[in-house]
Amino acid sequence: MSRILPVTDPAEAAALDRLAARDDFEARRIRRMLSMPDLSRTPGSPLHELVERVKSVPSFKDFDIIAIPEIVPASISFDLFDFPPTHPSRSTSDTYYIDEKHILRTHDTVFWYYYLQLPEIKERIARGESLGTLCYGKVYRKDEIDRRHMNVFHQMGGWYLMPEDKGNLSLDDLKSVLSDVVKSIFGPNCIYRFNVDVFPYTDPSLEVEVQVEGEWVEILGGGMPKKSVLKNMGVEGYVGWAFGFGLERLAIISMKLPDIRLLWSEDERVKKQLVLDRPFVEVSKYPSVTRDISFVVPKDFVPNNYFDLIRDLGGDLVQEVKLLDRFENAEKFGSDKVSYTFRTVYQSFERTLTSAEVDKIHRAIEEDTKKRFSATIR
């Protein structure tokens, strides 16, 4: 029987208090993202159903279920997991920093640390017991805007550890477990394969691809936890395997979902369509509205930060943002400036948008672009 192990961290509570006291753009954005529901724990959501399917895999019958903080120290997320100092995940262009030391969690694998710090788990390790854990929930990364990506999404991961002196584990053991995971999601007749991959915290590592309408699509990654990473967390003499995957990607494949935003819809007509293994049928497709914006900004401009601005002001009405052009001209703009042109596609699942309401949003985006990025609108 699985046990649920919630983890509370006073450092997270303190970070939330500091965040609540701020009124800047970034603080408001982060509070909004944290307030979004955890769909992996929302009955009726296909992401919740995916979690339940994976939990039902026989190998996980007695695994602990751990719920971890959403605000974590960057040192735990990156240093303990052997992320190189120059890894892009450490950058503010990829990760949401609460302050210099704390971030919104970027990967659910951070549960390794929190699980191993629990007093009862330390006691089990001292007794030489084997350990198994599953973890799932929201993660946060700055990302592009299109029908397949959001900056708030959900991951699920798990691992198994056993003392070295009680036997050996190999990549074949992990492949056997992952085969059961894939079949629990896509059915016993699905076609899948394993490829070599690389992750900072596992070695060797692999990825799993599943065949979808004749094409191979990556769905999850895994590997054997590096001994150096386990040692960073105070554990030696153990071997194991681990895996992790994004829930949205699997749901999109299972339902042939045309847009990731549909997973968050409160429209009952849409929610009735969100059933795993059943192709989504659009209840009504309302026309999109397109607007372009061109501006000149300093060269340290980061597009991912601009995507966040558009999300802040356009919300769920923004379907996609495309970079149409990036242009440098020292004579025209100056050697320290660069010109960008972006195209934003607006579309509602519930109604036809008017030009007037889109223009209002777009004007607000123009004004905030000037304020936040010292931009000159062209």
PLM-predicted stretches and their roles:
Residues 2-152, 161, 216, 221-230, ...:
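Class II aminoacyl-tRNA synthetase-like tRNA-binding/catalytic domains
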Residues 129-141, 186-192, 319-326:
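Conserved short secondary-structure elements within globular domains
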